[in-house]
Amino acid sequence: LMYQRAQELGCTGSHFVNPNGLHDPNHYSTAWDIYLFTREAMKNETFMKICSTASYVVPATNMSEERELYTTNSLISNWRIMGYQYDGADGIKTGSTEESGYCLVSTAKRSGRRLVAVVLGCKGNGATVESFSESAKLYNWAYNNFSMRQVAATDELYRQPVALSKQTDTVMLYPAQSVEAFLPKDAKDEDIRKSVTLKEDVVNAPVTAGQELGTLTITYNDQVCAEEPLLAQ
């Protein structure tokens, strides 16, 4: 089931032999696959609540006294190591073995923009753990050099040929909603390209308002940064 779900998420570089992540030569993954796992897990509100909790008091039971547990993620807590707390960080999980080094998948949110960072194989020696400092560097670089930018608006119109209509031979299409993309602040307009993919080269009448007839794809430097359905006007 783990392999099946990983494939459904688009993971291609992972191999599992245990559920706990402890070292085994045949147990491995990649930073990209871990990001894909994380992106899916973040859709679960309970998961995010747990991962963003710095400490939690476990009530006393008939087996143990009250206990307080702390996160090992120093981006959100100073309990374990001082000096790594990062403004906006709210997850997710540390991991380390002698073979893998110090690893961290984390997330941070500033000005409404959430980012995920994955660092693997970092060095550490008690009070200094590079997985936290390297993650902070990645966040600082991204937030300092990228910003949200509108790349499509609902008043943009595209043509769709129509057959079997007495009134017109085309219908106008528009993006279902305005589209923003997280792009370099110095991105040039000529490097942002738009392409239209129609479901059919020619659609038969009648066409109803709001009918989905295609997709608008926006790319930056040949990388897809957004896709949006095109609807009939």
Residues of each region from the PLM?
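Diglycine-centered glycine-rich loop/turn motifs
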Residues: 18-19
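Short, charged, amphipathic alpha-helices and their helix-cap/turn boundaries
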Residues: 1-15
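Domain-terminus/edge residues, biased toward the C-terminal soluble/receptor-binding domains
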Residues: 11-15, 25-28, 32-233
